[in-house]
């Protein structure tokens, strides 16, 4: 026992002397060995570790060189060999410091031979401290894309927080951002690459779209903000539309500052819309924007903000949804654009509101809607199939503009009926509407009819205000949980709209009232009388509720009918509709 104690004490003295020598040379390096030399009297076999944690802040950020070796407490020769090994490792580390600048120069070259040179003789183990806990060698080559897209490097340095920790401080900023982008692409983990790489996942074509996107530096900042808000939605919807997007170029990626991304799924629609280029740039802008709103239909719970709709385009859109398939057709009659742009200002807006029908839980804000178009919209829903047809008769638009101002308003409000949970705010809508709407529900379904003769316009505007309020409240009936706020709506236009719901089938038909109604004031009086004839065909219950509406008791006319045969109803309604349209 005494011999063992003496042996341990002698070993401790030897180690303390060596620790003093090491402390003079390497500072705090000897503390590890001296601190670990106090324990061999407790255990026969010990594990000694000498770590070198000196950080090269001037060249390599934060990395540590670790040397680990095992020492047997009973073997003096092995202890001496391990200490000699530690001294050799320290000498190699000093050599590696001398070659750091040469190593950085090797990183700058993009040649295959020099780019991948790793001076393994100088480093035993390099540990880069990061959150992921992964070990990376500092001799990695930067990405091959270095120098191709400098603006992309700036984005990668802005959006990646972990790349800031991986930067080599001795390198320049461009090299640091390139190395950070390369590590983020190859290793993944908790890295967050720049926005264009995460959203536009196109194989082998990311560089071209990145360069194309940076050409539009004027629109880039706003589009990045929009993408940051809708990143979860855009990633799911961008993937099936990459082929069409690459064909059209960067114009389909960045359209306007306030709009989201446009996915050109309908190439034929864009071709048809380009026919209006001969009439001016305004018409083309409006038609292109209508296609962007039409392509937004699969996005549920979307927040769409439309301000300052561009002027001068007629957009007739037809949606046929058969067994979950959507077919969009656009026909643009430009023969009546010579009468002026006032007739054509808001037809786009009505079509965009029509496309919002299938968007459940949508919040649509429409402000500053321009004046003057006739929008007759037809919805036929047969066995869960939705068919939307829009026909714009512009042959009588030259007779006046007041009649054409707000027919959009009634149609757009009617189109909101199927939007459950929608919040629609419409402000500053142009003036004038008599909304004659007929809804017939058969087999336990309500039937609503509102007929307002236009002869009341010459008596005053009070009757017309009540008429519009009744139609707007009628349109709120099918809005489950919908909140619609309509402000500053005034008078004077005719819009005949008919909705039929037959055995779960929804049909909205709107005849053309424009053939002979606006030739003069007498024609308006006759149309009002014809509307009175149609009103006389209603039941006593209809007339009673219609009178209650004007008395202020009710703002909505609800009439319930049960008809046995659908063909009979269609024939009777067509006969009743003929006096109004002629």
UniProtKB/Swiss-Prot annotation:
Function as written in the Swiss-Prot or TrEMBL entry: Participates in the formation of a gel matrix (sperm coagulum) entrapping the accessory gland secretions and ejaculated spermatozoa.
Biased composition (Polar residues): 137-161, 174-190, 325-335, 385-395, 445-455, 487-498, 506-529
Coiled coil: none
Full protein name: Semenogelin-2
Region described as Disordered: spans on this chain: 25-62, 91-190, 272-553
A single GO BP: sperm capacitation
Subunit field text: Interacts with SERPINA5.
Cell location: Secreted
Keyword Coiled coil: no
GO cellular component terms, A-Z: extracellular exosome
InterPro entries: Semenogelin
Source species: Macaca fascicularis (Crab-eating macaque)
Assigned protein family: Belongs to the semenogelin family.
Keyword field: Repeat, Secreted, Signal
Source superkingdom: Eukaryota
Stretch forming the signal peptide: 1-23
Ranges of biased composition (kind: Basic residues): 92-134
């Amino acid at each position: 026992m005494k011999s063992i104690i003496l042996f341990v004490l002698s070993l401790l003295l030897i180690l303390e002397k060596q620790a003093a020598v090491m402390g003079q040379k390497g500072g705090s390096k000897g503390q590890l060995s001296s601190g670990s030399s106090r324990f061999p009297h407790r255990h026969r076999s010990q594990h000694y570790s000498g770590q070198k944690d000196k950080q090269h802040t001037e060249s390599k950020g934060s990395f540590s060189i670790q040397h680990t070796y095992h020492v047997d407490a009973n073997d003096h020769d092995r202890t001496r060999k391990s200490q000699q090994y530690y001294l050799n490792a320290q000498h190699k580390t000093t050599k590696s410091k001398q070659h750091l600048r040469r190593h950085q120069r090797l990183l700058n070259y993009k040649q295959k031979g020099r780019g991948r040179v790793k001076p393994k003789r100088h480093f035993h183990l390099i540990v880069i401290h990061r959150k992921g806990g992964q070990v990376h060698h500092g001799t990695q080559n930067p990405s091959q894309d270095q120098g191709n897209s400098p603006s992309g490097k700036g984005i990668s340095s802005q959006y990646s927080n972990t790349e800031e920790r991986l930067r080599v401080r001795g390198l320049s900023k461009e090299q640091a951002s390139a190395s950070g982008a390369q590590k983020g692409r190859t290793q993944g983990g908790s890295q967050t690459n720049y926005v264009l790489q995460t959203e536009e996942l196109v194989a082998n074509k990311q560089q071209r779209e990145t360069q194309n996107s940076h050409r539009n530096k004027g629109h880039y900042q706003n589009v990045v903000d929009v993408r940051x808000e809708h990143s979860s939605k855009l990633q799911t919807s961008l993937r099936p539309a990459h082929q069409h997007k690459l064909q059209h170029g960067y114009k389909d990626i960045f359209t306007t500052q306030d709009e989201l991304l446009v996915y050109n799924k309908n190439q034929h629609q864009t071709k048809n819309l380009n026919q209006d280029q001969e009439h001016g740039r305004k018409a083309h802008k409006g038609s292109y924007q209508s296609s962007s709103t039409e392509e937004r239909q699969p996005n549920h719970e979307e927040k769409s903000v439309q301000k300052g709709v561009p002027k001068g385009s007629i957009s007739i859109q037809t949606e046929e949804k058969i067994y979950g398939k959507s077919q969009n057709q656009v026909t643009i009659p430009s023969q009546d654009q010579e009468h002026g742009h006032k007739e054509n200002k808001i037809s786009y807006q009505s079509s965009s509101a029509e496309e919002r029908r299938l968007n459940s839980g949508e919040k649509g804000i429409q402000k500053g809607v321009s004046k003057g178009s006739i929008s007759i919209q037809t919805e036929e829903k047969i066995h869960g199939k939705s068919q939307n047809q829009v026909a714009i008769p512009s042959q009588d638009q030259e007779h006046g503009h007041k009649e054409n101002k707000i027919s959009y308003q009634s149609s757009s409000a009617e189109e909101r009926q199927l939007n459950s949970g929608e919040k629609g705010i419409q402000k500053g809508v142009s003036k004038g509407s008599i909304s004659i709407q007929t809804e017939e529900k058969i087999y336990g379904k309500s039937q609503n009819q509102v007929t307002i003769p236009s002869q009341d316009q010459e008596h005053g505007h009070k009757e017309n205000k009540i008429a519009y309020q009744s139609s707007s409240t009628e349109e709120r009936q099918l809005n489950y949980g919908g909140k619609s706020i309509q402000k500053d709506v005034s008078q004077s236009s005719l819009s005949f709209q008919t909705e039929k719901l037959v055995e779960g089938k929804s049909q909205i038909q709107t005849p053309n009232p424009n053939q002979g109604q606006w030739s003069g004031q007498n024609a308006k009086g006759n149309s009002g009388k014809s509307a009175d004839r149609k009103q006389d065909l209603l039941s006593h219950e209809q007339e009673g509720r219609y009178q209650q509406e004007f008395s202020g008791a009710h703002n909505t006319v609800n009439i319930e009918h049960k008809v046995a045969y659908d063909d009979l109803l269609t024939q009777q309604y067509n006969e009743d509709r003929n006096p109004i349209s002629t």
